[in-house]
Amino acid sequence: MNINRSVPLSKALVGTWELLTREDFTPTGERHIDSSLGADPFGLLFYDSNGNFAAQFMKRARNTSTTEIATQAAPNNSRAQGGYDAYFGTYTTDDTEGTVTQRLVGALSRENVGQVLTRAMTIAGNELVIRVHTAASSGAPIVRTLLWRRVG
């Protein structure tokens, strides 16, 4: 849902966003740390007015001296490799539902190409909140909440 009702989500979303926080919680409210990107990853997210987007995430304490095992893609999510995840493609918005559907045209992980991801989004001022229902690497359900700040 777009908090600023005078501007539809499809318009308010356009811009460059920097990740502030990324938190995963189990249905019982327990915090879960994603080992592939860590508790506090870097991230940039871009949406243009023509329906194109790009997303990049990197583990803040990325260790270049060892090989990190790639994680499995979870439902409604992509797959990180070596502490990094990136994908791009096209998007559509549902201003009434407050959701964005992303179609992955390219991705770091081949198996993510063609994937369709739907995200619940809320924009208030220069902050974007994305909520994703997905699963931990163990398969247990989690809700991921990402807080972004507009930087462009």
PLM feature segments, named:
Residues M1-G152:
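Lipid interaction determinants
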